[in-house]
Regions:
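A hydrophobic, multi-pass inner-membrane permease signature
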Residues: 2-296
Length: 296
């Protein structure tokens, strides 16, 4: 018995091939800058000065990473950033869900006004000076909490969570209430397990935000041993550039590095850890983004 096959027109085939080629090229264009920095970080001083590094490292060596990890502050920076990212992501995701859930209920009195206030914060922010004065007045200057608390709840993430909660049938909650479940039991036992994809997406957004945060350290932290990783790497790069401007060839000859290879190394060091997390949440990430895009 012959199976019916849907014939594909020539135009559709051409369109499919074009899409594959176009998006492959686009993907390569987007990935190449990062690939180039990785290859440059493994290249020799001579190759980086001549600018001949393109697809593969030239004069392969690990001198750049030896210089980067020779700085003891890099380890305290990793520690601070890891603590901030883990605690901030866990608390931020939970608080975002707990904020969005009641806002998704039509029976909430003043819910529209509250949602308007949430949207208002996306358009008008308090600014740097009021934020600095607030942190100073509540006694959090030079405290690691100053790196965590300001970014706990994002209006954008709250809207994504609210959009997903609206898609959950209310009949599930009604059935749970008939069985005697409280609001907290419904939230933690029914709503959150159904929201894994969205929660993973929000957690990834939040984690990347905390991991890449540089400005908060500059504003609120004075002690070097409490600096986040991004501030440590930026300070390291600045010191390297200044040293090479003053001593020039002597410093480069001693370390077999220059400002460009150090910059490439710091980019890799700061980016790779957060990239390792992505494959574990990838299956949830696409679904979560689509939910936010369609229902938002």
């Amino acid at each position: 018995m012959e199976k019916n096959k849907i014939k594909t027109s020539t135009g559709e085939k051409i369109f499919t091939v074009f899409n594959y080629v176009f998006f492959t090229v686009l993907c390569l264009i987007m990935l190449y800058p990062f690939w180039h920095e990785i290859m440059l970080s493994f290249s020799s001083l001579e190759a980086s000065l001549k600018g001949g590094v393109f697809l593969w490292p030239k004069g392969f060596n690990l001198d750049t990473y030896k210089s980067v990890f020779k700085n003891p502050n890099i380890y305290t920076g990793f520690r601070t950033t890891l603590i901030v990212t883990v605690i901030g992501t866990a608390l931020g995701t939970l608080l975002t869900a707990m904020t969005a859930y009641p806002l998704s209920k039509s029976r909430l009195r003043g819910g529209k006004v509250m949602m308007t206030l949430v949207l208002f914060t996306m358009i008008f922010s308090a600014g740097m000076i009021p934020s600095f004065l607030l942190i100073q007045n509540i006694g959090l200057m030079d405290n690691i909490l100053a790196l965590i608390l300001p970014g706990l709840v994002s209006a954008y993430n709250c809207i994504i969570m609210k959009s997903f909660f609206l898609s959950i049938p209310e009949s599930l909650e009604e059935s749970a209430r008939i069985d005697g479940a409280t609001d907290l039991r419904i939230f933690f036992s029914i709503i959150l397990p159904l929201s894994k994809a969205t929660i993973a997406t929000i957690a990834l957004f939040t984690a990347v935000g905390y991991w890449n945060d540089y400005f908060s350290t500059v504003l609120y932290i004075r002690s070097v041993d409490k600096w986040a990783l991004q501030a440590v790497l930026r300070n390291m790069l600045t010191n390297t550039q200044q040293a090479m401007q003053q001593a020039g060839v002597n410093v480069m000859a001693q370390t077999n590095t220059n400002a460009e290879t150090i910059k490439a190394g710091t980019i890799v060091v700061s980016t790779v850890p957060i990239l390792i997390v992505y494959p574990f949440v990838q299956k949830y990430f696409v679904k979560g983004v689509m939910i936010g895009g369609v229902k938002g």
